[in-house]
């Protein structure tokens, strides 16, 4: 996130790996961040860059995108040892997503300590995720309380 060249002239740019649903998640994330921080997101140029070469689409990255935007705007780093998944509603609620078992398996394979996931998805994981902390969340506030690294 960079200050825009003029008040209210900010943009949100997502690299070409994102499909339309992921771009919608970014717009929702910006609205939720505005509500949580009381900062006008249109005063920032936001560049969301998904690395790794694969295309993404769907709402699953909503929590991650929201946390990343808030982190950039507030200049508060995020933990790098936990994965996060979940759709975010305009009211900041974390909604269930698909593929949670695969995402948790990937987090464990990557050596992460844990995964934050929608509370409604907790039932989708069995006890085979030994060694991975499973943290169910209901709201973006829950996500940020766990993910932001505050002094």
Indicate residue ranges for each PLM-predicted region:
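Peripheral, non-AAA+ core regions of ATP-driven protein-machinery
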Residues: 1-151
């Amino acid at each position: 996130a960079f200050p825009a060249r003029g008040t209210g002239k900010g943009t949100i740019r997502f690299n070409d790996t994102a499909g339309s649903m992921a771009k919608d998640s970014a717009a929702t994330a910006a609205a939720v961040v505005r509500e949580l921080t009381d900062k006008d997101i249109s005063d920032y140029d936001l560049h969301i860059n998904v690395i790794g070469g694969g295309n993404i689409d769907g709402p699953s990255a909503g929590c991650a995108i929201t946390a990343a935007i808030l982190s950039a705007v507030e200049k508060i780093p995020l933990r790098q040892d936990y994965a996060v998944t979940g759709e975010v509603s305009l009211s900041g609620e974390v909604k269930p997503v698909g593929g949670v078992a695969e995402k948790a398996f990937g987090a464990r394979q990557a050596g992460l300590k844990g995964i934050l996931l929608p509370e409604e998805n907790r039932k989708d994981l069995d006890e085979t995720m030994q060694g991975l902390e499973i943290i169910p969340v209901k709201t973006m506030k829950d996500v940020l309380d766990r993910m932001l690294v505050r002094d």
